[in-house]
């Protein structure tokens, strides 16, 4: 048995060398012989799928994906290979056979959402697939964020806000959902609501520089320049490399005609941290 395993290992190494040399047909012959010896080995089947994808033979890769081990793990791994190669029709053909299976993993719907968005350009279908992913699934957090982004892009702001608040409730330690709320209010020029949200976020994460910057920006938008400057100064004191706060304080001092030497130093420091930023 050990001798057989060693021969199989050597054969697989040879096949990989042939693939590296783009001799895909020769490599595939070796994989086929290995499958005859071990027909349920998912690793060999995946190598065959991968080899055909690299050879640009999508249909043959799909045939291997469909005829390989009848396990969810194998099918999803093969689907991932198709998605990575942007072979969306092949990925969809493989996943379509799983989406009506009540026992199939919820990841199937996440992958189908990717196809709906990237290949079909169908936002509503994408949302439908994402909505079917339950909270206990490991992809739920990502699915929720994508739903918010899609609704935002469609200017469905109230729907997006409902999901943002849902995210805050389900993930209270995730600051991103707080930042999303603030930015969505700012996008709609709802500055008072933005300030309320930013103040709440500041109370939860008092030392978070990004939240502090957004809080200061909201104050600035409301015309409360002195308070905004104080917030930005506190960020610079805490983090002298925060280019956004450096930039704000530098320009504020320059506009006021105060401490111009320091203003120049702050702006130079901001430029050093973000040399390609358009507003420095």
Where are these regions (language model features)?
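Alpha-solenoid helical repeat scaffolds
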Residues: 1-280
């Amino acid at each position: 048995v050990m001798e057989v395993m060693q021969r199989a290992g050597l054969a697989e190494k040879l096949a990989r060398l042939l693939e590296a040399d783009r001799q895909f047909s020769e490599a595939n012959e070796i994989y086929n012989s290995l499958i005859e010896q071990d027909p349920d080995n998912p690793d060999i089947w995946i190598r065959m799928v991968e080899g055909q994808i690299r050879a640009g033979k999508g249909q043959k890769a799909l045939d291997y994906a469909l005829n390989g081990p009848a396990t969810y793990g194998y099918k999803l791994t093969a689907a991932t290979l198709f998605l990575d190669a942007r072979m969306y029709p092949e990925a969809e053909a493989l996943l379509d056979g799983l989406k009506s299976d009540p026992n199939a993993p919820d990841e199937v719907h996440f992958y189908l959402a990717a196809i709906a968005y990237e290949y079909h350009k169908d936002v509503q279908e994408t949302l439908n697939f994402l909505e079917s992913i339950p909270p206990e699934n490991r992809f739920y957090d990502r699915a929720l964020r994508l739903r918010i982004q899609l609704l935002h892009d469609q200017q469905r702001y109230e729907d997006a806000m409902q999901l943002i608040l849902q995210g805050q409730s389900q993930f209270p330690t995730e600051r991103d959902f707080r930042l999303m709320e603030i930015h969505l209010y700012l996008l709609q020029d709802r500055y008072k609501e933005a300030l309320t949200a930013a103040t709440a976020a500041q109370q939860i994460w008092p030392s978070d520089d990004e939240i502090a910057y957004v809080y200061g920006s909201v104050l600035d938008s409301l015309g409360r320049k002195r308070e905004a400057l104080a917030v930005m100064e506190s960020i610079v004191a805490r983090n002298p490399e925060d280019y956004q706060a450096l930039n704000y304080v530098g320009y504020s001092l320059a506009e006021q005609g105060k401490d111009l030497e320091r203003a120049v130093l702050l702006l130079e420091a901001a430029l050093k941290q973000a040399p390609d930023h358009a507003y420095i």
